[in-house]
Amino acid sequence: MTGYYQLLGSIVLIGLGGLFAAIDAAISTVSPARVDELVRDQRPGAGSLRKVMADRPRYVNLVVLLRTSCEITATALLVVFIRYHFSMVWGLYLAAGIMVLASFVVVGVGPRTLGRQNAYSISLATALPLRLISWLLMPISRLLVLLGNALTPGRGFRNGPFASEIELREVVDLAQQRGVVAADERRMIESVFELGDTPAREVMVPRTEMIWIESDKTAGQAMTLAVRSGHSRIPVIGENVDDIVGVVYLKDLVEQTFCSTNGGRETTVARVMRPAVFVPDSKPLDALLREMQRDRNHMALLVDEYGAIAGLVSIEDVLEEIVGEIADEYDQAETAPVEDLGDKRFRVSARLPIEDVGELYGVEFDDDLDVDTVGGLLALELGRVPLPGAEVISHGLRLHAEGGTDHRGRVRIGTVLLSPAEPDGADDEEADHPG
């Protein structure tokens, strides 16, 4: 009968291991916000559960330690029991097989599923005992975490290993596959992850497309420009575009124009403008968004590494990186980045990256090519600033510039017509047809 005590102990420990696995899954699933609601509703055990949630990593480490201890001890007891009935070698193999099956079914899959399905009831029932066990075993648990950190390359974890960004991305992908998260919701979540890796210059309005006004103009003129352009914030320049001295707000212009006797004709923009905010064009978008929220500022001027104005970015530009394009009643329909005209002909934005052109035509561009966009490639081949009607042949493609005048009357190219170069025109490296 002595040997059966080991078998009974092994069975009990396997059951305890399953219980700790269920607790692990439960406290990892519950939401702190929902726990606060349970506390307000005075649910039994909610107060203890809130204290567990306040230091959740430590309690997860403790549960993992208890589950592992139960499994290892159960294996040892099972080996002792089987040794009385089989040879030592076969006993080890049999014990290993039984524990693999038990660990997977009884400790792994089943209890974890139950823990996730009944997360709040299990967490409420076990929070107080778990806190008591934590108080008793705290020195051992912390010692093992410190030992694990010492053996882990890098900085380690203060509270033990937890989900990395890659693991969270995998969870989001799995949630979409199972229909829990919609495709657009998944895209927004992915955009949040990428926000910290995206510099502000990638979403800015380039300097060449900025709308600005001179500081010596009147408030009435600025009001007219704001109405015509549809912008509520306009940079104010001094001697040139690199000398931005402030930002004028439509709200201030309305107040100055309609509340004064002269309609703002005698008030200069310099008297109405507010200070401008300057940030490096390499600033990550997540940091820029936090800064804008903290300072209650909706526009920042971007400065490149040489100290020149690279462009501007608004809080709307940052939010569009998360939720997609935001268009209001003043926004005009923008030209699609790529328009398929048939017969391998495309109309593309002059700002389209040349890598996208390579994908359209299967063309390889050299890595040392000192341009990033189609417009830049056109200017490189021409050797000058391209005008509408300019045409060149590069990498077996014919590029034809299209455009017109901008809001200040300057001639700009906006789109480029792409088509395969004619075989008989392969020798013509440049053909310029002014439009």
Swiss-Prot record:
CNNM transmembrane domain mapped to chain residues: 1-185
Q: Where in the cell is it found?
A: Cell membrane
Write out the entry's keywords from A to Z.
CBS domain, Cell membrane, Membrane, Repeat, Transmembrane, Transmembrane helix
The residues forming a coiled coil are: none
Q: Which GO terms describe its cellular component?
A: plasma membrane
Q: Which InterPro entries match?
A: CBS_dom (IPR000644), CBS_dom_sf (IPR046342), CNNM (IPR002550), FAD-bd_PCMH-like_sf (IPR036318), FAD-bd_PCMH_sub2 (IPR016169), Ion_transp-like_CBS (IPR044751), Transptr-assoc_dom (IPR005170)
An example Gene Ontology molecular-function term? flavin adenine dinucleotide binding
Its membrane topology, per UniProt?
A: Multi-pass membrane protein
Q: Which domain of life is it from?
A: Bacteria
Task: State if Translocase is listed as a keyword.
Answer: no
Q: What residue ranges are annotated as transmembrane? A: 7-27, 89-109
Task: Identify its protein family.
Answer: Belongs to the UPF0053 family.
- Quote the protein name from its UniProt record: UPF0053 protein Mb2387c
What is the species of this protein?
A: Mycobacterium bovis (strain ATCC BAA-935 / AF2122/97)
